[in-house]
Structure formats: C-alpha cells, structure tokens
Amino acid sequence: IPSGNIKKLVYFQKLGFYVVDSNIQLSLTKKMIEIKNTNVRFAEPGDEKGVRALARVAFKHNRFNSDPQISKKVACKIKEEWAGNYFSGKRGRWMVVVEYKKNIIGFLQLIRKNYKTIVIDLIAVDKKNRGKGLAKTMISYASINCLGSHEVIEVGTQIANTESLALYAKLGFSIISSSYVLHRHQ
C-alpha cells in the first residue's frame, strides 16, 4: 500500500492485515563506472549450491523475517528458494556472483521489469565480506553488462535496512516511492 494512503492502510488493518515492513523504492538513471574485479561474473549452473547457502543466511531485513508468525527457519528457506529459482529459470533474467577461493561470497539477482528497466530482486554479500565494496562492484557489473543506453535500475529495500539505504544513496540512487507491506495469516 503506498505510504501516503493511510485510509487504505486502516481499511486493510480492520480486515486483519498488519504491517510487517515499510519499503522504499529507489532508482538509478545513469550508468555506473565500471569497477574491475576478476572475481565478479555472471552465475553458472555450478554456482547454485553456493548461492542457495548464502541466501539461506544473508537476509535479516525483509518481510518474512519481520513477521512474528513466520519462523526464522521458514523465512530463511523462502530466500533460499527465491534465489534458487534463478537456476531453474523460474525467476530472474541475470545473476551476478562474486567468487573467492571457489566460494560464492556475493550474488545479485536481477529481473527485467520492462524494456527500459531492470530491478535488483535480491542482493547478498557474505557477512565476513561486507563493507569491502562487493555490492557496489556487482551493481556496477550489472549496470555495464545488463543495461542498454537510457535504461534504469530499480530496487526496493526495507526502511530498517539502513546499510542498504546508505549504499544505494552513495551509488546515486534516488527515492521514487514508499509503501507498507502487509501480511495476514489465517
């Protein structure tokens, strides 16, 4: 629900829905400068196990982990399957990975929204390797290799995920909208 539509929010809350997340959508309308890193490449079928393992543990700020009625185990499994769906052709147009000593330490899953826009669907960096510029490098790689001229990258993240918001601001992303994410369990 768009964050400016409080009337709609209240309506759904009266139906038993509750807020689990406040989401910020951002966009980048310029190409990034290429950052050379020989460990960054497009994913290959053999990367699935490493990507799934990272996805299982990397996500803390999301609507599944925030929902008190969804167990931590289930929330982690959802993200693992979400990332794994790239390899079965069910979700994602591209996946960029960072490999170090034969281990996947980062991945970026992208979908095509329309002919001018790609969306960062998932992005994760192994906890031990955060703060080293790997997310920036993967986004740069995607910008150079997945975007045509005059195309846009969009991303959504949780307002509680201040690290991601700081990264996107540093890279030149601008806020385009915000919304509430609601769940209802029966």
Q: Over which residues does each language-model region extend?
A:
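A short beta-loop-alpha structural element at the N-terminal edge
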Residues: 39-62
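A short, internal acetyl-CoA/4′-phosphopantetheine-binding micro-motif in the GNAT/acyltransferase core
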Residues: 2, 123-130, 157-158
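A conserved beta-turn-beta hairpin within the catalytic core of GNAT-like acetyltransferases
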Residues: 20-23, 112-121, 130, 149-151, ...
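Conserved active-site tyrosine of GNAT-family acetyltransferases
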Residues: 10-12, 168, 173
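A conserved beta-strand-loop-helix scaffold within acyl/acetyltransferase catalytic domains
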Residues: 64-78, 84-118, 122-125
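Conserved GNAT acetyl-CoA-binding A-motif
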Residues: 1-3, 117, 146-157
